[in-house]
Amino acid sequence: MKVLLELLLGYSVHILAHELPDLPRTQHPPKSELSYWCTYVPQCDFCWDCQDGICKNKITESHFIDSNHSIVNCRVFRDSKTQSCLYEISSKMPNHFSMECLHPRPYTGNEIFMQTWGGGVTINNYL
């Protein structure tokens, strides 16, 4: 199952890099691309649906965290000319994270601060 998931993800990366146009800077990436953007920076606010301090992952719909302060504001954009996928991450120490769309890698910034809710699975297990 894990191998199949990795193959599908690799295929989607290939499609993203070669067939999709530039993505202007946005805080709301297209729904069809959420799984891509949320895989590499899973703490982005657009990856979570938060109500009353409980946040549910939009991709898996089964991972919960209980601290809204763990969620960071993100803007993403894609430059097809340079084959770059970029994140602007706003937290206590705002930064930029860029990667080659064809060779993505996870951001390892503040996910260690995310807290699970009700014995749920941590964010690290969802990657």
Swiss-Prot record:
A Pfam family that this protein carries is v110
- Stretch forming the signal peptide: 1-17
Cite the entry's keywords alphabetically. Signal
The coiled-coil regions, if any, are none
Asked if the keyword Signal belongs to this entry, the reply reads yes
UniProt keyword Signal, yes or no: yes
Q: Which family does it belong to?
A: Belongs to the asfivirus MGF 110 family.
User: In UniProt terms, what function does this protein have?
Assistant: Plays a role in virus cell tropism, and may be required for efficient virus replication in macrophages.
Its protein name is Protein MGF 110-14L
Q: Which organism is it from?
A: African swine fever virus (isolate Tick/Malawi/Lil 20-1/1983)
